[in-house]
């Protein structure tokens, strides 16, 4: 489906193997060296979520009893929880594996699951990907709200100071990094 405009909210999650929990909320090792960035853009008015998921260091095959092995779960920091949204598993011919696109509800995973619940309390949700050798999760990361257009890092300056900020955007225009670069005249 085509990406809508505008979005009502944006979220990011930085996944690491040390944040993985089993179903009883016990810390469980994820895949060593795995990292991940998941960026989500929500239009809760039209019940649409768009996603850009990048997983360097995750070894397929993916495996989960759910429809796919890449999810947003409901669970605060340190708490396991049920999957609420399933996304296509990342793919690729090498490293990193990626998945991107948009999907429209209604959400059918869990009772009462709506995108506006994520908007109301993003810290109550995390994202993860499950692999055959790491069934509890290869990695996991808590959702964090991002203002549309990115975040002010405080880095940078003016051309008079010799330094200026430079923003880098990934696929679909999502801010993926801000660097400060010297201005050379």
Language-model regions: role of each:
Residues 1-70, 74-184:
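Metal-centered catalytic cores of metalloenzymes
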């Amino acid at each position: 489906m085509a990406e809508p405009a505008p979005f009502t909210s944006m979220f990011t999650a930085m996944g690491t193997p040390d944040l993985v929990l089993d179903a009883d909320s016990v810390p469980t090792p994820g895949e060593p060296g795995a990292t991940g960035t998941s960026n989500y853009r929500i239009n809760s008015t039209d019940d649409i979520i768009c996603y850009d998921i990048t997983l360097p260091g995750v070894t397929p095959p993916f495996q989960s009893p759910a429809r796919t092995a890449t999810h947003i779960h409901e669970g605060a920091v340190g708490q396991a929880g049920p999957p609420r949204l399933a996304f296509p598993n990342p793919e690729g011919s090498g490293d990193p594996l990626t998945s991107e696109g948009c999907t429209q509800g209604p959400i059918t995973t869990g009772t009462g699951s709506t995108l506006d619940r994520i908007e109301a309390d993003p810290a109550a949700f995390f994202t993860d990907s499950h692999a055959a050798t790491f069934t509890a999760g290869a990695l996991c990361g808590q959702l964090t709200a991002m203002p549309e257009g990115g975040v002010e890092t405080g880095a940078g300056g003016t051309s008079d100071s010799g330094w200026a900020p430079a923003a880098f955007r990934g696929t679909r225009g999502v801010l993926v990094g801000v660097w400060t670069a010297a201005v050379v005249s």
